Structure formats: C-alpha cells, structure tokens
C-alpha cells in the first residue's frame, strides 16, 4: 500500500513539474518573440508569485495623506519582478522607465501587451544608479546627469498625456527617491509641502514589504535635507536644468 502511494505521489510530482516547465517555456517564448528580439531581455520567473510592490503613486500618497490631493492614473512604481510578464501586472502603462538599468549587463526590463512588448527606457549611462536618497551623491556628475535624464523624460511623458511607470529592482530606494522628488516638487508648487505631506511621502516609501527598519526615515530626511538650503524646485532647476515652464506644466497634470 505504501509503495503504491509513493509511486502515485512521484507520478503527481513529475506531472506537475513537467507542466511547470511547459508553462515556463511558454512564458519565455511569448516574452521573447516579436519586435526587439535582438535585445537582451530580462525575464523574472519570480513574477509568477512574487509581490510586484506596485502602486499608483498619486493614489498611494492620497491614501497616506488622508485626502485626495493628486490626480491619479498618471504614474506608478514597482519592483522589477514584472519583467517578462503581462503589462497588466503594472497597470498597463504607455511608457516604462528602468531606473536599475546596468550598462554592463545591458539587460532590458519589459512587459508585454497582446501585440507588442513594452521595453523599459534607459539612457546612455555609464553607471548603475544607486543611493539617490543621499543628497551628497548628487554631486557626482554621472549620477546626477543620469537621474536627471529620467526625471526630465518622465515629466515630458506625463505632460504628453502618457501613463508612466518606473521601477528599480525592489521598487524601494531608487523608485522611492524619484517618487519623493516628484511629490515633493508638486506639493511645494501648490504650497502643500507641510509636515503631513512629508509624512505621506515617507508612508508611501514604507509600503515596500522588503524595507528594513534601519532604512526608515530616508525619504523624509531626503526632502528635509533639500529644503534646508533651497526649494525643491530650485534643487531640480540647479541639478537638472529642467525649465520652470515644464515644471509648471507637469504640476498642472497632478493638481488641476
């Protein structure tokens, strides 16, 4: 009897394992076929079960603030586990930005729609972006120029009416810093950058499940460090040379 049970269990295991392999092969083929197949594309099998750390940025901040301040369905953030899977896992964006692009690996994160793949945009960068939440790192020209290229292009896409999504690996620090800058800038332009708004920015950051306690306060401190010496708008004007007109136009997209 025991032998029969063991044989039956082994059969079930082999069957399920075979089905899993077939499914993984299907996902890989579906992901890689089509346009841009000459690129090195990142497929994250963990996307089958892993938390995407996905959220609409404005909706998340509104929830944290306790009041609907920002227009939603403009921009979202996540981890990189979605790569190789349906764009539906990250809200079906029009444009995708990959903050974690590595010029050494040249691996492109992407999602697929029914008829095409949406490839994460990156720029002619020489480094992998890291530690953006530490303001002293913005003195590094390569970090500054690359980060500003992302911010400038994100603003352009939002102004054009496109739904934007950006991600890093965990969707935590790099994504958190870009989120903090965007919300900090927009709220400052509307005289809403108060203690409650800074708390909301930090609250959005802490929604990431992989965040460890020692990182608590990083987004709050980042915004406060900028505000010690200048406005966030002046910080972006100085570091990124983004025009005041573009800042005004993107502000109107978030708050009518």
Where are these regions (language model features)?
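Ser/Thr-glycine-rich phosphate-binding loops at phosphate-binding pockets of nucleotides
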Residues: 170, 174-175
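Cys-dependent protein tyrosine phosphatase-like superfamily
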Residues: 7-165, 177-256
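Short, Lys/Arg-rich N-terminal segment immediately upstream of the first membrane anchor
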Residues: 1-6
